[in-house]
């Protein structure tokens, strides 16, 4: 069941990429779905697939290599970057501008694409990113039960709790499962502040992830969402990423 779910999510993330890349990776989905954490597109560099134990590179014939082989790798083109960027923005870049200036775009299902390029600055503030050279697609996964060991400890805490860890260590995955447990098993009123859309994975008002009985503030600024929640939703617990 988990393997099927991971493959479905991985395939959904691949469909956000340009066709030139997605069509080469789709046949590898059953093999890669459980392990790939990130898909990294770097202009004029080989396509990289980041796994917990290693980084692999896609060859032109659809194979994988853990070393870069001269002349054999699939090199990311400018068209690949542009097409992927437009795709992850649903061909509505203007509507995603608030996310873009913060260096990321959240996609359907909670997958997130980090963006790197040249900053357009006005009065000391970044107002846009142009000439994008790197896109990092982080695969969102659900692992129900991963927060079981934390639940009993956290439910007894009076005060705040900070969960920290290295990048890709599973913080968001654990936090999502905690939200589910606290709002169902714990029967707490939980306000879930999902500023980047990674926890609930909201798409057109529908949650793509199981976040239990939480009240979700999707794409809100954290401070504003907290004020709204406290004023009107009477939360016993406020969760943010």
Put a short name on every predicted segment.
Residues 87, 91-158:
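P-loop NTP-binding catalytic core
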Residues 167:
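The conserved Walker
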Residues 174, 178:
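Hydrophobic positions on the alpha1 helix immediately C-terminal to the Walker A/P-loop
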Residues 163:
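Hydrophobic anchor at the beta1->P-loop junction of P-loop NTPases
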Residues 1-109:
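N-terminal accessory targeting/assembly segments
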Residues 182-229:
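P-loop NTPase switch/communication element
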């Amino acid at each position: 069941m988990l393997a099927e779910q991971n493959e479905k999510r991985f395939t959904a993330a691949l469909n956000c990429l340009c066709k030139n890349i997605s069509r080469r990776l789709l046949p590898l989905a059953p093999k890669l779905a459980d392990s790939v954490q990130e898909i990294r597109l770097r202009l004029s560099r080989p396509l990289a697939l980041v796994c917990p134990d290693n980084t692999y590179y896609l060859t032109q014939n659809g194979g994988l290599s853990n070393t870069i082989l001269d002349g054999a790798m699939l090199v990311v083109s400018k068209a690949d970057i542009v097409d992927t960027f437009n795709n992850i923005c649903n061909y509505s870049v203007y509507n995603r501008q608030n996310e873009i200036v913060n260096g990321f775009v959240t996609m359907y299902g909670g997958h997130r694409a980090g963006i790197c390029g040249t900053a357009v600055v006005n009065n000391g503030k970044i107002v846009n990113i142009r000439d994008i050279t790197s896109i990092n697609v982080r695969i969102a996964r659900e692992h129900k039960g991963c927060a079981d060991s934390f639940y009993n400890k956290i439910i007894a805490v009076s005060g705040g709790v900070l969960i920290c860890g290295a990048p890709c260590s599973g913080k968001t995955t654990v936090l999502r499962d905690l939200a589910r447990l606290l709002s169902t098993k714990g029967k707490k009123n939980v306000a879930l502040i999902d500023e980047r859309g990674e926890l609930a994975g909201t798409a057109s008002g529908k949650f793509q992830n199981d976040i239990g009985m939480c009240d979700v503030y999707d794409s809100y600024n954290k401070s504003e969402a907290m004020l709204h929640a406290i004023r009107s939703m009477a939360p016993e617990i406020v969760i943010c990423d």
